[in-house]
């Protein structure tokens, strides 16, 4: 079930600057916080593909990924427009946003209606329905492809890095909490 997470002391104020984001549950038991600002971006310009040092992984490995921060950082280092967009958002409480894991991207497309219903209550928030129905993940499938979630068809597949699909800023909450405990 999706819900709005407010910044401390700003509960009930439905302006973008007063919210941490919209929380959703993932199939694997994790929770994710989505910042309701989106942009259709290339994952990576083909000329920069060799700068992305992450190896391609299978769809199963991409679905099992439980941390998006390292993969987003690798994309950012390679010059990814999608990663650059997602990481410009931060939260004092939850840290830096990144691109979603493949499972989180699939949940975003699956829960689009619930997410948009809450986003309509927040002044300044974007609606997913106004963007491409394909959401980038932070995982590479092959040399020239990244994993995306398709909202039209309800499945994941590898797609060319140069396509402009939704960059959805997201923090995996359980991962963010684990990282705070280690320091």
Each language-model region and where it sits:
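An exposed tryptophan-centered "aromatic clamp" motif
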Residues: 79-98, 102-158, 173
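Extracellular carbohydrate recognition
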Residues: 159-163
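Extracellular adhesion/carbohydrate-recognition regions
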Residues: 1-93, 164-170, 176-183
């Amino acid at each position: 079930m999706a819900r709005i997470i407010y910044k401390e002391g700003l509960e009930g104020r439905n302006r973008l600057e007063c919210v941490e984001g919209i929380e959703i549950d993932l199939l694997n038991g994790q929770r994710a916080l989505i910042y309701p600002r989106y942009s259709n971006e290339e994952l990576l310009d083909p000329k920069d593909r060799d700068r992305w040092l992450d190896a391609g992984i299978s769809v199963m490995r991409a679905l099992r990924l439980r941390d998006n921060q390292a993969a987003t950082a690798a994309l950012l280092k390679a010059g990814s427009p999608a990663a650059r967009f997602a990481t410009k958002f931060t939260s004092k409480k939850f840290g830096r946003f990144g691109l979603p894991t493949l499972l989180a991207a699939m949940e975003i497309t699956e829960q689009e209606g619930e997410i948009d219903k809450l986003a309509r209550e927040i002044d300044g928030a974007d609606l997913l329905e106004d963007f491409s129905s394909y959401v980038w993940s932070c995982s590479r499938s092959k040399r020239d492809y990244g994993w995306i979630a398709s909202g039209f068809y309800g499945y994941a597949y590898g797609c060319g890095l140069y396509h402009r699909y939704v960059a959805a800023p997201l923090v995996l909450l359980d991962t963010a909490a684990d990282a705070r405990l280690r320091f």
